[in-house]
Structure formats: C-alpha cells, structure tokens
C-alpha cells in the first residue's frame, strides 16, 4: 500500500498465474502448456528474424501476421486483431467493448482473469452459475429486461474443459443482438467447434484465440481476435491509445510460420487429444470422476481423496497439477495433458499414493 497509488489500485485482486517453478526434473502439468515444441518452421523463422532488423520497430499493424491468421481461419485480414497474448487482447476487449455501465455476464466457474479486468476497469459484472454437471446452459444467457453490458465465456470452458456446440453458442449470440458476445477459444483446437465461421453472420460476435496452446508458442505471447470490422476498429483504437507496437519482430515471424504449418499443427493436436483420452480412462480406472474434456487438460476429482492433499503429495514426487481453492471446485484437480510418458508417470505416482 502506498499513498501514491491511484484509488482503484488498492481495490484490485490481481490474477494469480499458474506456478512456473525453476526446479529441475519436474513433470509440469499445471499450466496447460503444449508438451510438444513449436513447429520447426516457426523456430527457423524466429532465427531468421533475429538479425540487424531488430534495431527497427516492428510493423504496428502486423499486416503479415494478420494475413496469415486470416488465411488459416477463413476471414479477411481486416477482421483480425492481434495482441501480446490473448490476455492483452481480452484486456482491450473489456476496455473497448464492455464499459457501458451495465453488468458483464460470465460463468461463475471460468477464467479467473475476467473479474480482474472488471475490477481494473471498474466494470460491474454478474456471474452465471454453471449447471450441476458443470455445463454452460445457453438458456441462462437469455436476456431479461435491460441488455447485458457484455457476455464472455471460454469454449471449451476453463477450468472444466466442457464445450458447447457451435449451434449452442449461436443461440446465445442470436438471443443478445444488442450485446457483444465474446467467445474465448484458447483451447478450441483440442476437440471443440470454433465459431469463427459465424463472425460474418453476427456483428455482435467476437472470437478470441491464442497461439500459446495448440501452436506451442506460450513463450512468444501472441493472441488474436476475429470479428466484424467495427469491433476490430474499436480494439485498434484502444490498442493505439496504449501501445502501438505490441507484436515484436520475432513473435510476428514465429507466429506467421506456426499459423502456416498446418501439418505440424494437426499432428501435434491429434497427439494431445489421443493422450487425453488414454489419461482420462486411466484416471477413471483409479476411481476419479473425470469431466468430459475438449481441451488439453482434464478436470477430475476423487471421492475418497482430498484434492489439495493429492496435489501436495504429487508435488513431493515432482509432479505439478493445478488446484483451485474456489467454491464448487475445491475438490477438483486440473491436469494438463503431457506426453504419454509424463501422463504414465502421473498415473504411476497416483497408484503409489493410493496404496501407501
């Protein structure tokens, strides 16, 4: 606390990121990083960009990167907004599109950065409970009276991993024509349906994605939004009032190459999905309740073992998983899908814990 702080600073409850320990030989299954490295073509592009041109500012419009993203997802380049990770994109979304004085709506169990943004920008919000089986119910997002100041939810949801079908998302968008609906698709490439094809049909729909998960570039920090030209223009106005150069030359080069290497993208995400199904079956065989997942993680609880204690005992064995001290989910563990060997080590450690 400092007397020099702006008044809002003392009211903030900042986001707590997943642990990034520096200890050697850890099996790190706590922050949903891809177990496979970036596309070799992305690494080559980064190396090629690391030359004399680094003395020059990058393209403030990121035209080449936006073009590569547009080609990969099937929209026009002027329907793409890029930022320094999807977290920065989301921060601009809250500033540009959600400050209407009316509550923004999002699930009670969801990405915990959403209420942080609301606190930072002094935006009122309303949480919408998930169903008893941890699903987002489109019927809960039907407007009642005054339009919401915005609607945002991950699909697949995080940390649950459950996904809505494209037609279910469209029901929410169609039912709220006077409200911007933001679909946070950080994990969509691991088995869910993207609603990117709907942005031409609905001018109130914005889709946010990242290269951190399925493109294995969490260390570069590149995210993007897809939407109508009017929504994208609003985001550009906020960005250029904050930082005109969010994407550096190395990140732009690597991200472009990653978006263009479809074969590597498909091969690695299919490998993650196959491992997820094997790990889910192994966890169920050990007595875990495992929610259906369309993400690169699973959300599981054991009826006879406390989740926090399990996380601690796994850590003693150099295996990190994520535990949330939050109502309704404090007995769940979120477990990132690692390599087959990492997931086998997890199952082996759990067997030893249960038998001890």
Curated annotation (Swiss-Prot):
Its cofactor is pyridoxal 5'-phosphate. It comes from the Bacteria. It catalyses: L-histidinol phosphate + 2-oxoglutarate = 3-(imidazol-4-yl)-2-oxopropyl phosphate + L-glutamate. The modification N6-(pyridoxal phosphate)lysine is found at residue 213. Pfam families: Aminotran_1_2 (PF00155). Homodimer. Belongs to the class-II pyridoxal-phosphate-dependent aminotransferase family. Histidinol-phosphate aminotransferase subfamily. One of its GO terms (biological process) is L-histidine biosynthetic process. This is Histidinol-phosphate aminotransferase 1.
